[in-house]
């Protein structure tokens, strides 16, 4: 395979990515790009980033053999990359630390963020507290309802949480509001985007901060499993946890990459969030990618039991990986993800986030069809405490 060097200088992954924003944001993006291109090569910045990941986040996160579950399934060996063990409970904090350090380097005292499941909001509020920054988090009011405990966590950390009432009142609407705030307060504000979407340099910047996940796996799997995996499986909403584990494996051609989208109530139901499976190429939130849209190009409302996958677009690098055939993308329904959540709790004593449960469900589906010496590595991107209410509600339990 020829060396992988995307995006190009204009931020394109083939036809995807780029910069599609209002003129008022061009200067801010140019400034951000210059700062990032300086910092990513600056030994002092890299040293500080790595120090924070070790001492504040608790990295490296381990890889773990789900031996009992693998035995029960009677096929491939399932391994988990335990991002749920990070401080704040998910992969999101890796990227937030990187961007907060960048904000500090640029002299921006105020950070803003959008959040769906609340994990990125919590991670942003956490690093803002750590570095003494003002923090405002935009969150769809539907997600505020679904993720009440994370909303309270953000407030405890000193952040202002702004519920967004427009549209479907979910992640895309929160992103729209955050963009508006950024345009208005560009001089003193840094926008910490939580996923590998948005205008360049965000998709590559977020990817780069998250590749610590896959880089650790490259070292850990030979030590703990004896070799690299045959399959790497990760859930895809915007796609940052998946890019973080996929990117270092792209040159390893014998490792198959499988992204798992939210098929909701089924792809035929129209109630899902599988942009790569069912979307068309369009422009959303500053970049060209696959978007869930109707015949008139209007963004469609999405659905997933998991707030973090409930997004009508996907990172442009995933769009490129799909078209190039380097990664394959599949859908897992709400019911399949919930079943995997319950089984993971019962069999392995690990409570995964509903986002991660989609990836686990795919691994569980694949394992019995594969030989016993096959290795499937799943990015267990976060823990499931935040999803207690959703899971209990689905089971008809009130608390």
Curated annotation (Swiss-Prot):
PROSITE patterns recorded: TRP_SYNTHASE_BETA
Keyword Transmembrane helix found: no
N6-(pyridoxal phosphate)lysine found at: 92
CDD domains: Trp-synth_B
Assigned EC number: 4.2.1.20
Cofactor: pyridoxal 5'-phosphate
The protein's enzyme class: lyase
Name the record gives this protein: Tryptophan synthase beta chain
Organism whose genome encodes this protein: Bordetella petrii (strain ATCC BAA-461 / DSM 12804 / CCUG 43448)
Organism taxonomic ancestry: Bacteria, Pseudomonadati, Pseudomonadota, Betaproteobacteria, Burkholderiales
């Amino acid at each position: 395979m020829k060396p992988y060097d995307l995006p190009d200088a204009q931020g394109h992954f083939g036809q995807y990515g780029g910069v599609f924003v209002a003129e008022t944001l061009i200067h801010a993006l140019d400034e951000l790009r210059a700062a990032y291109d300086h910092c990513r090569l600056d030994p002092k910045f890299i040293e500080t980033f790595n120090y924070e990941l070790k001492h504040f986040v608790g990295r490296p996160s381990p890889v773990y053999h789900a031996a009992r579950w693998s035995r029960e399934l009677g096929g491939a060996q399932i391994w988990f990359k335990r991002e749920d063990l990070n401080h704040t409970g998910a992969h999101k904090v890796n990227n937030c630390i990187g961007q907060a350090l960048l904000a500090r380097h640029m002299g921006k005292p105020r950070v803003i963020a959008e959040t769906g499941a609340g994990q990125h909001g919590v991670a942003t509020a956490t690093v803002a507290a750590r570095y003494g920054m003002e923090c405002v988090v935009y969150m769809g009011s539907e997600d505020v309802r679904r993720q009440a405990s994370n909303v309270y966590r953000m407030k405890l950390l000193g952040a202002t949480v702004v519920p967004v009432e427009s549209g479907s009142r979910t992640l895309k609407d929160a992103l729209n509001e955050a963009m508006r705030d950024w345009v208005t307060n560009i001089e003193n504000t840094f926008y910490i985007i939580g996923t590998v979407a948005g205008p360049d340099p965000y998709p590559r910047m977020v990817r780069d901060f998250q590749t610590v996940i896959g880089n650790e796996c490259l070292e850990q799997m030979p030590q703990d499993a004896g070799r690299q995996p045959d399959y790497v499986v990760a859930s895809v909403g915007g796609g940052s946890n998946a890019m973080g584990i996929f990117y270092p494996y792209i040159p390893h051609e014998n490792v198959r990459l499988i992204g798992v989208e939210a098929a909701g109530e089924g792809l035929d139901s129209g109630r899902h969030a599988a942009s790569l499976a069912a979307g068309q190429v369009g422009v959303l939130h500053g970049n060209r990618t696959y978007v869930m849209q109707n015949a008139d190009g209007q963004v469609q409302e999405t659905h997933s039991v998991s707030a973090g996958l409930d997004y009508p677009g996907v990172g442009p690098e995933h769009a490129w990986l799909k078209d190039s055939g380097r990664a394959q993308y599949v859908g897992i329904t709400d019911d399949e993800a919930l079943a995997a959540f319950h089984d993971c709790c019962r069999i392995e004593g690990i409570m995964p986030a509903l986002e991660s449960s989609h990836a686990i469900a795919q691994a569980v589906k694949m394992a019995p069809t594969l030989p016993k010496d096959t290795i499937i590595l799943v990015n267990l991107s976060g823990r499931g405490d935040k999803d207690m209410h959703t899971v209990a509600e689905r089971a008809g339990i009130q608390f």
